């Protein structure tokens, strides 16, 4: 309602602005965007700027982005960078900032410079409407409608530009439950899209062979599937397993040097959080298990593949401590004491596997056991890492991270 009031205020000043809502959730975000482009006034526009509800663009946003589209008719999308207003709220938000800073500073920048292609982030970007139409419009076949449109647009020969010096303020999910749902969608959706678009990409005649290789191998296979799988299988399976089997020998460069170099490169995206890099790596190793399960769900097109849970953003509510008026408290106590016959609603007991993340707890326990075996018998010297990594799995498994731990 605040948005509607604000729109009415600007309309009263003579600004051509409209407030539109729809009465259903068909197609989720893709359905809303598709329906939004059907309005008559959209036909008078060449470009569309997109922002999620928690994004706060600066007043000069359009002045700094639209000229790229005006002066280069080959460009379909101008993507800007996200800036986070609550990155210091808790350790979970700091980890997210580190991951997303790396994504924008390196992945998006490299894709823009080398291939003129990258995945649209779903918000904080400006699209050329004719490019959207050329690609077939918004589709709700997956939960990553933004990536779906970006890939189809690239296959039509359009180019993308990433403008890293334009930053739009936004909010990070501060509860682990919300973050977990978000990561499921961000991992399951791309894998599902990869499966559905594989032949379409291979049969396309408008893009070069090397661009197809970039799309299929670099963007989809390595970036969305293999990266999570290799991380988990190496750090959380191969190293613990080598403790029990002396035949499995992992060279020192594979255990220390290469992982250290990769970690340091990723940490360059957030210099202010460099001191958290070890904890961040441990957390990313834990999350790789969740992302693998989501990616497999997407590849198999099963289970929660089309599940869409809106990411919870608390805003200022996370900073407000719940209070109760003294008189209200007395009234509640009085009711409890004077009306003993009033039936109480029984709260359903939450089962252990519903409240906690059992797969993370199981893996963490196994890693700690391997650490104990290494310390007592194998003597390979991995036990310090194994203990720390195992504890990280247990912390996430019992959800003692974020602003609302159990």
Residue ranges and their predicted role:
Residues 3, 22-23, 29-30, 34-40, ...:
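Cytosol-/stroma-facing membrane-proximal "stalk/adaptor" domains immediately downstream
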Residues 7-47, 59-143, 148, 154-155, ...:
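Long helical/loop segments within the catalytic core of UDP-sugar-dependent glycosyltransferases
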Residues 20-22, 163-165, 311:
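Conserved beta-strand termini and adjacent loop/short-helix elements that scaffold enzyme active sites
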Residues 81, 157, 161-169:
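Catalytic beta-strand/loop signature of glycosyltransferases that borders the donor
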Residues 164-178, 306:
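Active-site donor/metal-binding and catalytic loop motifs
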Residues 204-230, 315-376:
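Loop-to-transmembrane boundary segments
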Residues 221-314, 360-406:
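Membrane-embedded multi-pass helical conduit in multi-pass membrane proteins
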